Swiss-Prot record:
Any one of the GO CC terms: cytosol
GO biological process: regulation of cell division
Transport in keyword set: yes
Protein name, as recorded: Protein MioC
Entry-linked Pfam families: Flavodoxin_1
Its biological purpose: Probable electron transporter required for biotin synthase activity.
Length: 147
């Protein structure tokens, strides 16, 4: 089993690029990783460390590729008390639902007993053309919280 499972939800690929970049950085730091783009709930370990990275689609909506995962969290209410997670949202402050998808995912993970490590990073694409940069900066402090 990987030390850290990265879960990405993306419409245009931005969150996937961030997940791949962070997986590379985590491996350079000595962690093993598994990156899953739009996984189903049953594809994930019910314990360990998850890093959830999601863009926001439409009016604060979960990206299509992560909707089945989100809906399973809501409907099945799995026991995720053995999961610690970090969260990164990507969105635009032009919308009043800025990073609404990561807010929804974070809430459902907590409702299922998962414990959040660190604060959620919310990346405004209007300020960061390359969302990998602020995500990498955040990752350094997040990894320290895992120790």
């Amino acid at each position: 089993m990987a030390d850290i499972t990265l879960i990405s939800g993306s419409t245009l690929g931005g969150a996937e690029y961030v997940a791949e970049h962070l997986a590379e950085k985590l491996e350079e730091a000595g962690f093993t990783t598994e990156t899953l783009h739009g996984p189903l709930l049953e594809d994930l370990p019910a314990s360990g460390i998850w890093l959830v990275i999601s863009s926001t689609h439409g009016a604060g909506d979960i990206p299509d590729n992560l909707s089945p995962f989100y809906e399973a969290l809501q409907e099945q209410k799995p026991d995720l008390s053995a999961v610690r997670f970090g969260a990164i949202g990507i969105g635009s402050r032009e919308y009043d639902t800025f990073c609404g998808a990561i807010d929804k995912l974070e809430a459902e993970l907590k409702n299922s007993g998962a414990k959040q490590t660190g604060e959620t990073l919310k990346i405004n694409i209007l300020d960061h053309d390359i969302p990998e940069d602020p995500a990498e900066e955040w990752l350094g402090s997040w990894v320290n919280l895992l120790k």
